[in-house]
């Protein structure tokens, strides 16, 4: 017979046919359940190797009833009985509760006699201590199984999934060691003998912990005040110096300035209301003209694209006539240049919207960033003004600064030359500092449109770009504004006489200016170490910005909770709503809001916050930490109990219950708004 259809534990279960009808018609046909006249049963029904079981430990506390369904038992498997007899037999103490429960039934005398007889039981473990614990804690699986109609073909085994579901239905408690038992009692681990589970000493139901399942999965870091330690605490002195090299000294002031620039709007009557899809034109206040070599009157505006709502920069050349319409298509290759050191152009077009012939170049938006000329060669007042966002003191052209500028400008030229283009315009006035120690070239692509097509080869134009970068570095190193190719040798000779000058930097400037066969690709190996330093500094700065970003994420999370509470607070349609009355389900939201924003009092003697006044006039305290703690615990939905009260009501609830109530009320509000309902229906 199949092992699943036989079990030695079935021999100690009273036969229900005998209880219902007085005799069992299958007693001579191999019925392996217990009968009153067991001696009259055939030998096949009483295998000598089978051990008896104490009925008290069977775990079936349900009384026998006349309404129990009848059954048709199957034959006992000799193979399973003989294999089970080899297991260790441990005597169990006989509790009284089960025998007394059986004695109250119709067959109480027989059950009492069977309970008083000495019996042994086959167990899966030899721990007698665990067996005693089993007598105290009744098996929840057995109680669940006793409530299910009996079927002989399914009485001995149940699947792991079924046993877990039965336990959940019976007492709604979690059985944490069910998987370990299934592996011990079933070779495959997929089937569990239900009756052996109820008698196994290793299976002891654990005491139920309230919401233990939720506690194991809850994000416990969300109910505390979310704080991120300053990143600089984890850096040594050298790393702090490297990071601050690229990080603005007053970053909050810089971020505020960027936000003000972004949201700045003005209505200027002399400007057109819109140009194509661009609108909201605002002149950019530049200290000096950033495009001085164009020989045209230039105006720069901040505009908003009506198609996507993003800001862009307008460069307008006034009184310009495009002689060759095909030249405007020269902007297309520049739209494909992607480099952090090149301000990308978007498009170019001619227009009469400014009441005169003009050509407009549209670039990606950037704030009013200073140029290198503003930082090093403008008047002291302008220099202090332009560098105030990045530096606490005016910037000086030290060796580290010059190498940083050189690596960025050479990287920009490498991206441009690799695209088959030439910058044609690199000067102190169109190289902008868009961040602390971060440079970007502005206005590229304009010369390709306004100039006639040149017969000069591309390699010669690219060589001029390298020369322009060398002149910029030489001007910064010698603190000389007007450095040209004719005066470069004299300035370079004077630079070599300075003791603090880096010899490798002088060699780089000399190669950039005077080497006629120079290609930008040949300079990259010499700049590799400085580019790696810049890369490491940028990564450290990225960690700092991530710290700031994490703080703003926490602020955003708490702001959303506050907004949700404010949407639900004191709405006029809730005045006559019974759910929001003092006896309604949503009244707890009002009590919780009062609990969060309560004004605590401080006893001068103990210096501890209290909610009751003392003999002396109490000191009021706006406890913001209490507010943040409540919001974090509400977001996490913790099980911490709090007292919500007013003059007439006192309610003890957990943050989890309050969170569920708030979410339900807010979803109901959203439903009414989506259905355009003023009151709840």
From Swiss-Prot:
A zinc finger (C3H1-type) spans 9-38. Signal peptide: none annotated. GO terms for cellular component: cytosol; P-body; PAN complex. Residues 41-50 have a biased composition (Low complexity). Residues 96-106 have a biased composition (Polar residues). The modification Phosphoserine is found at residue 165. GO terms for molecular function: poly(A) binding; zinc ion binding. Its main location: cytoplasm. InterPro entries: Kinase-like_dom_sf, PAN3, Pan3_PK. Keywords: Cytoplasm, Metal-binding, Phosphoprotein, Zinc, Zinc-finger. The keyword Transmembrane helix does not apply. It comes from the Eukaryota. GO terms for biological process: nuclear-transcribed mRNA poly(A) tail shortening. It is found in: Cytoplasm. Residues 38-58, 82-123 are annotated as: Disordered. Belongs to the protein kinase superfamily. PAN3 family. PANTHER family: DEADENYLATION COMPLEX SUBUNIT PAN3, PAB-DEPENDENT POLY(A)-SPECIFIC RIBONUCLEASE SUBUNIT PAN3-LIKE. Regulatory subunit of the poly(A)-nuclease (PAN) deadenylation complex. This is PAB-dependent poly(A)-specific ribonuclease subunit pan3-like.
